[in-house]
């Protein structure tokens, strides 16, 4: 896709990209390179991944990161119950074959006779699912900054060349024509390692300007120019506030959609639950909405 095609197709999904976003997506696709997207909460990092999956017609796998994730949740796992059932099934035959062997020889014989680590017992987790030859996918690694450094290290091989080395099984490498689209998001909760950053191209999504918010509302809702301008003014004010839960672009779109249905002064003032997700923010958000109510309410 060209830069203009990326811009137009993202807009068709309702995602309004800046030039920075379009060029970052173009570079990611041209080089088959993971894209690390940073920005404040609510600026549209996750929405970009969803919109791009829709544009490209790819299934999206989402890996929500948090401290404590292990490789059997991120990369792969084994079906231990099936392994035990396999052992039980061949046990009578094995007992007969190893009855005259020493312990070391018996272990070697069992290990060579029963495939405990074959494809039949391997459970692919999100990362492995994107390179196992089952079709091209988009992988969203969401909030990578909340994962531990050990989890970061776990992903290096995958992000480098879309392959995973699995002990006792071998190396799984992605077919050339199925290389995944990989987007990592970060809220800068902690500094990512240099090794992680070197494996990715980079995009920082800025907070949206008033004009950009108005454009989003025009594409995503049917509110008129006056209401869109008033809502955009509110959003710009929200972005400058130190809220416990910053208001996201998707939340402001939901609020505008509500106002389409009930734009009365009372309706606007009683719909703040669409914006406020922490009771400590209610007073500040409510005061801001009151300042712009004459531009928003019908």
Segments from the language model and where they lie:
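C-terminal regulatory/interaction module of P-loop NTP-utilizing enzymes
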Residues: 1-298
